[in-house]
């Protein structure tokens, strides 16, 4: 789910999803509160973090909340790569917040744009550091395997080889 209203009551929806066996993967950012990829420093502030924490509070107690994305395609080209430390800080802050509130361990990670020039470096960066700093998982949005394509035409054979020893789950 890309965005939610963290002030609304989601009990009915989450109950219907649970009844259907559906788990929620939720981006905690919203159109109003998100990192500005071009100039992330000013957007990473107390008001922004409080919005993210409100989203965690709204969804952490649902058993079918599967995971939280700390960001989605914030880094979408070489020019926006300097936003990476801010995404990593959001991951850290969310993990610490979840722990401090006594919520169950809910995985937090990043969903990346499939930018060939920094794809692997971003995956490595999000997986380095202390347990509090690094992602619980790493996802990348890859649209290369669209019909008519194949495992090799889409380049997935090379991706599987490159990420073969990656130590956190890839989504």
Annotate each language-model stretch with its function.
Residues 1-40, 88-109:
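Aromatic-lined substrate-binding rim segments of carbohydrate-active enzymes
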Residues 10-24, 54-64, 125-133, 160-165:
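Acidic (Asp/Glu)-rich catalytic clusters
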Residues 80-171:
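Noncatalytic carbohydrate-binding groove/subsite architecture in carbohydrate-active enzymes
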Residues 15, 50-57, 63, 85-92, ...:
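Solvent-exposed, polar/charged alpha-helical surfaces in well-ordered, non-transmembrane soluble domains
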Residues 32, 36-38, 47-54:
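Aromatic/His-enriched, Gly/Pro-containing loop or helix-boundary segments
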Residues 1-11, 33-35, 43-46, 76-77, ...:
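Acidic-and-aromatic substrate-binding clefts and catalytic sites of carbohydrate-active enzymes
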Residues 53-83, 109-111:
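Active-site groove signature of glycoside hydrolases
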Residues 1-2, 24-28, 66-70, 108-110, ...:
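Hydrophobic faces of well-ordered beta-strands that scaffold small-molecule active sites
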């Amino acid at each position: 789910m890309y965005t939610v209203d963290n002030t609304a009551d989601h009990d009915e929806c989450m109950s219907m999803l649970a009844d259907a066996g559906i788990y929620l993967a939720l981006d905690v950012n919203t159109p109003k509160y998100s990192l500005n990829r071009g100039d992330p420093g000013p957007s990473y502030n107390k008001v922004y973090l409080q919005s993210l924490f409100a989203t965690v509070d709204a969804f952490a107690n649902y058993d079918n909340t599967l995971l939280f994305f700390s960001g989605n395609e914030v880094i979408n080209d070489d020019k926006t790569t300097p936003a990476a430390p801010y995404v990593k800080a959001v991951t850290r802050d969310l993990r610490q917040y979840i722990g401090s509130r006594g919520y169950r361990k809910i995985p937090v990670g990043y969903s990346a744009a499939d930018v060939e020039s920094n794809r692997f470096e971003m995956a490595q960066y999000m997986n380095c550091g202390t347990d509090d700093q690094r992602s619980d998982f790493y996802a990348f949005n890859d649209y290369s395997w669209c019909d008519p394509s194949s495992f090799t035409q889409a380049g997935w054979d090379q991706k599987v080889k490159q990420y073969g020893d990656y130590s956190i789950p890839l989504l």
